[in-house]
């Protein structure tokens, strides 16, 4: 009995999000085509600054410690498409993200 295996080349994309606390700021995707990196709109970085100032964290080690890179499960989309989809989702959900971030100030 002869077994023949066919290997399909899959696009395996590694996606990650740079965020400060729960506020995303940069989305990155890596696949065999290279790296795609997109910074979210300015309102996200402005939100980080506002929350950090209100918490008195600007210029402190604690501010720096709140920056994290979260890796997402691998995707079969291209890096370009995966990043585009995540960026669109975050931009649509900005008000929700802002509300959550500001509620942490209470």
For each predicted feature, which ranges?
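Intrinsically disordered, low-complexity regions enriched in small/polar residues
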Residues: 5-8, 21, 46, 65, ...
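Short non-domain terminal segments
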Residues: 1-4, 42, 88, 92
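Charged, low-complexity, helix-prone segments enriched in Lys/Glu/Asp/Gln
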Residues: 14, 44-54, 83, 90-97
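Short, charged/polar N-terminal "headpieces" of proteins
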Residues: 2-38
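Acidic, low-complexity intrinsically disordered segments
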Residues: 59-106
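Acidic, aromatic-enriched beta-alpha/helix-loop junctions
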Residues: 32-69
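Generic, low-specificity signal for short hydrophobic/alpha-helical stretches with a mild N-terminal bias
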Residues: 26-30, 45, 49, 72, ...
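Alpha-helical context
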Residues: 16, 20, 24-27, 58-62, ...
């Amino acid at each position: 009995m002869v077994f023949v295996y066919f290997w399909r080349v899959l696009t395996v994309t590694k996606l990650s999000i740079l965020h400060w606390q729960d506020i995303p700021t940069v989305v990155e995707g890596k696949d065999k085509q290279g790296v795609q990196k997109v910074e979210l709109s300015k309102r996200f970085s402005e939100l980080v600054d506002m929350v950090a100032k209100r918490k008195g964290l600007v210029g402190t080690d604690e501010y720096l410690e709140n920056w994290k890179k979260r890796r997402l499960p691998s995707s079969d989309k291209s890096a370009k498409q995966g990043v585009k989809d995540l960026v669109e989702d975050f931009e649509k959900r900005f008000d929700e993200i802002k509300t959550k971030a500001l509620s942490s100030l209470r």
